[in-house]
């Protein structure tokens, strides 16, 4: 049976059951261009730190600014905040509907079966948020118990935020987990999930063990630090962040005086745009994933804001679900930039094969979201749950909300796309049309 036919049967016969998470609160995705002023603490310690740093060493790159604002150990946005959900600054697809995580779980199982059912799976999520997506994936794996009984499944979470790792541990294991202080171990937390799977936390993707792995990165790459580059007559200059001379407690963008080394490394000679955003961290990570996947098997599934190398200025901030000036009140808003999937493809190079990007609407449609929604609606007699399911579906699929803005991209081994006379691999689910028979 082909991967798509197998996927269709799984959706049609409802092997994935409705969970209590169907009652999770639904939040409407917003992308407004205006922001109502909010009261925040006037003593912005992070701003003072940045001003002192600039006075001491000169203007800083946008990449350095993002790194400080998001992951500064004392005042970084990700380090001490629960920024997700109704009372946070943004909402993600796994928080909107259980169907999203279920379909990604089915995708993993479909790829595992296509690979010949390896004896072990490492489920690796980069930037797991509240742990909602990993929780949904593990529930799907549990519902396929007979198929996966002989498979050794472990969970590996790459998370730099102490606050979020606490939330993830509570969700996945049902209890708090103390941080380990063993300097010889890359694992800083470990436990057993509610479904009986070992789970470990790491600060860096480089520390995750080798092995057949599914790497899930949902809204991860868009938060990595970028460099903003501007083309002038004699080459590329880097956009920097400096202190506004007229307002000493404010920051502003300025153009660097020297040619950009980042541009020499990453910008192609035939680049048609006059302004680009480059993410060296994304290059390092995607190359690492490609090498691991081609050596040990598995796949990477990336879902994020993104484009194919045509956009220019996408750097923006979000606070309380509204757009927020990136240089105002640093540390109180999320900072993000669209993922350049053309750049990601170039960075993978010949190390592995790439699929996509395709829009979230197309990917979920190909994964059988309509079939899955129908099954869930038929299994529930609760009108409130039915309304939540329909609302969540609309937010995920509507082109004006998440359906068009989010893209799916995958990295797979070269062998996954090779067909021989003896072996014909099924298409990779989600990136090929689901055939209805």
Swiss-Prot record:
GO BP term (any one): mitochondrial respiratory chain complex I assembly
InterPro entries: NDUFAF7 (IPR003788), NDUFAF7_sf (IPR038375), SAM-dependent_MTases_sf (IPR029063)
EC number per UniProt: 2.1.1.320
GO MF term (any one): protein-arginine omega-N symmetric methyltransferase activity
Cystines in this chain: none
Recorded catalytic activity of this chain's protein: L-arginyl-[protein] + 2 S-adenosyl-L-methionine = N(omega),N(omega)'-dimethyl-L-arginyl-[protein] + 2 S-adenosyl-L-homocysteine + 2 H(+)
Statement: the UniProt record of this protein carries the keyword Protein transport: no
Subcellular location: Mitochondrion
Keywords: Methyltransferase, Mitochondrion, Transferase, Transit peptide
GO CC terms: mitochondrion
Residue interval of the organelle targeting sequence: 1-42
Protein family (similarity comment): Belongs to the NDUFAF7 family.
Reported function: Arginine methyltransferase involved in the assembly or stability of mitochondrial NADH:ubiquinone oxidoreductase complex (complex I). Acts by mediating symmetric dimethylation of 'Arg-118' of ndufs2 after it assembles into the complex I, stabilizing the early intermediate complex.
UniProt protein name: Protein arginine methyltransferase NDUFAF7, mitochondrial
Organism the protein comes from: Xenopus laevis
């Amino acid at each position: 049976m082909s991967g798509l036919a197998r996927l269709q049967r799984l959706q049609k016969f409802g092997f994935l059951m409705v969970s209590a998470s169907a009652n999770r609160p639904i939040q409407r995705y917003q992308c407004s261009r205006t922001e109502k002023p909010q009261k925040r603490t006037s003593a912005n310690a992070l701003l003072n730190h940045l001003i002192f740093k600039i006075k001491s060493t000169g203007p800083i790159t946008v990449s350095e600014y993002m790194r400080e604002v998001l992951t500064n150990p004392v005042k970084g946005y990700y380090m001490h905040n629960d920024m997700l959900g109704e009372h946070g600054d943004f909402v993600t697809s796994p928080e909107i509907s259980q169907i999203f995580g279920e379909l990604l779980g089915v995708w993993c199982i479909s790829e595992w079966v296509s690979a010949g059912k390896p004896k072990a799976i490492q489920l690796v999520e980069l930037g797991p948020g509240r742990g909602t997506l990993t929780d949904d994936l593990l529930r799907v794996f549990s519902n396929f118990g007979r198929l996966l009984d002989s498979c050794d499944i472990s969970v590996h979470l790459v998370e730099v935020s102490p606050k979020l790792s606490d939330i993830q541990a509570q969700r996945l294991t049902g209890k708090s987990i103390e941080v380990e202080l063993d300097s010889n171990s890359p694992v800083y937390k470990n436990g057993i999930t509610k479904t009986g799977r070992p789970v470990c936390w790491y600060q860096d993707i480089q520390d995750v063990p080798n092995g057949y792995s599914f790497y899930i990165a949902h809204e991860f790459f868009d938060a990595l630090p970028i460099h903003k580059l501007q083309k002038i007559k004699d080459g590329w200059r880097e956009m920097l962040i400096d202190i506004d001379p007229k307002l000493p407690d404010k920051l502003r963008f300025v153009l660097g005086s020297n040619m950009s080394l980042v541009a020499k490394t990453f910008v192609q000679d035939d680049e048609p745009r006059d302004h680009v955003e480059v993410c060296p961290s994304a290059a390092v990570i995607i190359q690492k994933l490609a090498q691991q996947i081609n050596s040990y098997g598995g796949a990477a599934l990336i879902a994020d804001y993104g484009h194919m190398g045509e956009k220019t200025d996408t750097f923006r901030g979000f606070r309380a679900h509204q757009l927020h000036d990136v240089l105002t009140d640093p540390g109180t808003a999320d900072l993000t930039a669209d993922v350049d999937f053309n750049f990601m493809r170039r960075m993978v190079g010949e190390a592995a094969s790439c699929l996509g990007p395709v829009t979230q609407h197309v990917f979920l449609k190909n994964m059988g979201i309509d079939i899955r929604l129908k099954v869930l609606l038929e299994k529930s007699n609760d009108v409130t749950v039915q309304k939540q399911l329909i609302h969540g579906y609309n937010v995920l699929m509507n082109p004006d909300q998440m359906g068009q803005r989010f893209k799916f991209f995958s990295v797979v081994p070269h062998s996954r796309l090779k067909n021989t006379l003896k072996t014909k691999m099924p298409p990779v689910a989600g990136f090929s049309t689901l055939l209805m028979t």
